[in-house]
Each structure stands twice: as structure tokens, then as C-alpha cells.
């Protein structure tokens, strides 16, 4: 019988991992800042993609200064991640592609974000106008090339809540009751032909315009 004895020394470094958000931070999230709703056809592959993408961003937390990437949040847009083939817009035409419907979620979130007074850091419109949001208020995704992003510019954490059921998609942004500083934000698109110029306006409690920003110019085919 042979007995082998070894003295094994393991150099371990203790790392104190702090949670991303504290209970005090959570207590600051006490108010629905904005909401937006679109409708979709349920019971088919596209509707399933809408619901899948919406579920992936439900309860998503952004700390102050943190940037949201739609592609990182819902991707990869592949079959093994729950997505199916459905109509997508490619070069101004409807074709069958994986993940058709995910852009309805990004576009619904885009409107929710603008209603919350938050500007995009990256956003592109579809090559062809869509029917679920006005022109100039859509946000497309092309995996690996086009993303949709925004940064939490509040002094408080924010949470994205989604609900997609029976053909109705609603997205809410929650944060602190003082996040908007008393300003009511409204995006408006001015459409001329195939071009839409989108502005974000802010109004105080008396209805006076206190903020105006040209966001983007969207050109459609």
C-alpha cells in the first residue's frame, strides 16, 4: 500500500463584493415616470418574439450614469435564445428573418424613454416606416451593426417594467418622484414626405415650454 501525502497551499484573495444597489437605493424608486403602449398580433411567431424580448428587459435596473444597450439586453437574436422567424424590414422591404418583432419592443421603449425626458445615445430608424409608432419615433436593431442605447441621466436609479400579453405591449420607467424636476416631457415628430424631424419638448406645471431639443432626422424609403 502506497500512501501519498501532499501539502497543498492555495493563495486565495478575498474580494468583498458589494451589491449593485442597496436597500436605500431601492427606496428611492417610488414613482412611475413614464409609460407607453403599442399593440401587436399575438399567437404567432412575431408576437412570440415581441413577448420574448419584452420579458428580457423586464425589471432591468439602471444606476445613474449607466448606459443601456438594447442588443446586450435582448440578444443574441438567435433561435437558441427563444426567437423565431417572422417578417423583418431589410433594405426597405419585408422579408422573413430571425427575431422579427424585437424592434417593436425597442421602439416602445424609445417612446417611454423620451416621455421620461431621457435622450438616446444611439438610435436609428427603420428603412421603412412601421405601423406601431409614428414616423421618427421608432428604434431599430440590426445585430452586430445597429444598436439602440440610452444613458440614465437621472440622479436616481431607474427600473424598466414591461408587460406583453394578449397583443398589448406596455413599458414603464420607474424612478424617484423628483427625477423629472416637475417637467412634463413630450416627443413630437414633424413629418414631410419621407422625412421626420423629431423634437423633445418639456413643460412646467403651468404648461410653459421650458425645454426644446431636436433629437434626430429620420429618412424612410
Question: What residues fall within each predicted segment?
Answer:
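Well-ordered beta-sheet/strand-loop patches within structured domains
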Residues: 1-221
Amino acid at each position: 500500500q502506497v500512501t501519498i501525502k501532499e501539502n497543498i497551499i492555495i493563495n486565495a484573495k478575498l474580494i468583498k463584493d458589494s451589491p449593485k444597489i442597496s436597500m436605500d437605493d431601492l427606496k428611492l424608486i417610488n414613482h412611475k415616470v413614464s409609460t407607453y403602449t403599442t399593440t401587436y398580433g399575438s399567437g404567432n411567431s412575431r408576437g412570440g418574439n415581441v413577448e420574448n424580448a419584452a420579458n428580457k428587459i423586464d425589471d432591468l435596473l439602471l444606476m445613474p450614469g449607466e448606459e443601456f444597450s438594447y442588443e446586450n439586453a435582448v440578444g443574441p437574436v438567435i433561435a437558441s435564445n427563444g426567437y423565431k422567424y417572422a417578417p423583418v424590414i431589410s433594405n426597405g422591404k419585408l422579408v422573413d428573418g430571425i427575431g422579427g418583432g424585437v424592434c417593436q419592443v425597442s421602439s416602445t421603449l424609445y417612446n417611454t424613454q423620451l416621455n421620461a425626458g431621457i435622450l438616446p445615445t444611439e438610435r436609428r430608424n427603420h428603412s421603412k416606416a412601421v405601423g406601431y409608432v409614428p414616423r421618427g419615433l421608432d428604434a431599430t436593431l440590426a445585430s452586430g451593426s445597429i444598436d439602440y442605447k440610452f444613458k440614465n441621466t437621472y440622479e436616481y436609479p431607474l427600473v424598466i417594467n414591461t408587460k406583453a400579453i394578449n397583443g398589448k405591449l406596455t413599458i414603464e420607467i420607474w424612478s424617484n418622484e423628483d427625477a423629472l424636476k416637475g417637467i412634463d416631457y413630450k416627443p413630437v415628430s414633424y413629418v414631410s414626405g419621407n422625412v421626420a424631424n423629431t423634437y423633445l419638448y418639456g413643460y412646467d406645471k403651468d404648461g410653459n415650454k421650458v425645454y426644446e431639443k431636436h433629437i434626430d432626422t429620420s429618412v424612410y424609403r
